[in-house]
Amino acid sequence: MLQGVHNWTSNNIYVLNQKVVVDSEATLNIEAGTIIKGTAGQGSLASALVIARGGMINANGTENAPIIFTSVSDNIEIGQSSGTNLGPNDQGLWGGVLILGNAPCSFSGDVSELQIEGIPADDTFGLYGGNNPNDNSGSFTYVSIRHGGAVIGADNEINGLTLGGVGDNTIINNVEVVANSDDGIEFFGGTVNANNLLIWASGDDGIDIDQAYSGTISNSVVILGDNSDHALEIDGPEGSLFDSFILNNITLIGNEITENGEYADYRSNAMGSTNNIYALSLIHI
C-alpha cells in the first residue's frame, strides 16, 4: 500500500510482484520513459497496479518516451521502447492497471459502490463508484500496457486498463493495450473521457462499456488478434441510473481468421451514440 507521494523515475525498472495499491489521498507520479514489469501469478497472487478511490496517478509519458507496463518475461531494458522476445499471443503474463473513482455508476439494486472486477472480494481497496461526476484520479497519458490479463478466478481475468467510476476531471489519452488476455480497456460507469486509444490483440473484447458509462471515447483503434472476441462490447445500465456514452471516430480492424471476431455486441439496453465508425476485415458485422 503506497501512502503519501511516490515518484517512479525512468532510470529504474520497477517490478510489481503483488498488487501495488495507491491508497486514498496518496499520489504516484511516474516519469516519462519509465518501465514497470509485473510478475506472473493468479488469484490473490496476481500482480497489478491499483489506484484506489481518492488516490491519484500522474503517469505522463511522451510520444518518444512512453511509460510501459509489461511482464517480467519481456526483455525490454531501460531506454528501449520494446523488447524482442514476446508477441501478440503472449497474454496473461501479469495483471494490469486499475483506476477507481467516485463518479456515478448504475449498479443493480442502486447500491452506491461495488467491488471492481479483477480484484478479489476480500481486498477492500477494490471499491468504486460514488456521486461526484467531476472526480479527479489524475492523468494517464502516453502509456503502453502489454501482455497482461492474469486469471483471478473462473472467467475472471484482469483487463489491460480498468476504469471504475472514474470522473471527468481525470485525463486519459494516448493509451495502448497490447496482448491482454481479457478486455483491452473496460469502462465501468463513470464520466471520464478518453481519446487516442489503441487496443491490439486482446483475448476478449477491445473496448468494453458497462454500468451507464457516460463519457466520450474518440479517435481510437481496435485491432483484433487471433483470440479476440468483439471489437466493442457495450452493456446498458444495471440500476435506475440511465446515462449514455458517445463513440466518435473509431476504427475497428479484424484479422479475417478470428471466427468469433465481431464488430460489436450491444446488450442489456445499451444506451449511447456512435459516430463515424470505420470497420474492416471483420468476419461478423
Which residue ranges define each predicted feature?
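Beta-strand/loop edge motif enriched in small/polar residues
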Residues: 1-282
